[in-house]
Amino acid sequence: MTTEKNLIVFKTTTMVAIALCLISLLAACSGNSGSGSKTSADKTSVSSDDKSLLGAGSTFVYPLFSKLFYVYDQKTGVRINYQSIGSGGGILQLKNKTVDFGDSDAPLSDEQTKGMGAEVLHVPMCSGAVVISYNIPGITDTLKLTPDVLADIYLGKVTKWNDAKIKNLNSTVQLPAMNIAVAHRSDGSGTTNIFTDYLSKISPDWKSKVGKGTAVNWPAGLGGKGNEGVAGLIKQTPGGIGYIELAYAIQNKMLFAQIQNKSGNFVTPTIASTSAAGNVQMPADSKVSLTNTDAPDGYPISGFTWALLYKEQSYSSRSKNRAENLVNLLWWNIHEGQNYCAGLYYAPLSKEATAIAENILKSATYKGTPILTAGANSK
């Protein structure tokens, strides 16, 4: 009998202890202000900390943003957590209001614009080159490619590295009878938009069969996530070819081709040739394509990248201070931040593009009142 009573007491005590532990855990979780979990209140605001901004989008510009946001944090104490998930992902997160800003190498389409729920501003950050990188064992030469040959490779019409179309352009290179392994993006990508926009301009066949966009139905090849993923596919695949941003190619010590431009010149992607392509008349909303440039020394597969933010910043319980921190960050990016572009193989904005970016940022409001005042934030 005593044993039975002891068992009952033990079981009861154990159950009470477990219940108390569960209550303590639930209390701790509900009171936890860390980033590990979200409550229903969190869903209406990206963060309660106005000194910590959230961004997401383009992998194309990630090497530059990493530098800019580190420097800006050191200067101002404002932290920026940027998720390099691709332009499509950045647009979606901005639409869902889970980030303060997105970034895309493709301007919003008319359909995307309608779905955003309110006006979105496009602020140009810089321009960059999409390079055609390759991995042919034993070959260290810089290859030359024409627009039609590049299109045929991605259409699956040219499948061997020693195809006559490639050999005729590179007569001094001993190209092997190796299969071409095409790599492309698997995620929604502004880099893809730049590349397919170019192919659509130079190849009627590509335009009619595939077209342009941040995501397309690829006729051939394997997909990788982000510029990092495509670079990885090229490096690990003998015979590989793919399109990546210039900074990724240089940082990974990868070969990339000279591309023939509209003027008939074979152009190496550099800061100078990207800047030449970007020397265009920019409209007031900054949405412009740089591909297939008319500039004789311009690299033909170049493009801008844009920070995206809602014009009216009073939404989802955002504070005025948070809105000011975001606009101040982007203002710094288009001014002092431009000094870091060339060192990371991006082309800084021209004076004209900077002036347009300034006007766009000056149109941002909080409860209808401009966030930037005359002469403000010009340092």
Task: Enumerate the predicted regions with their spans.
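Bacterial N-terminal signal peptides that target proteins for export
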Residues: 2-16
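C-terminal motif of bacterial Sec signal peptides marking the signal peptidase cleavage site
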Residues: 24-28
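Flexible loop/hinge segments at secondary-structure junctions
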Residues: 29-379
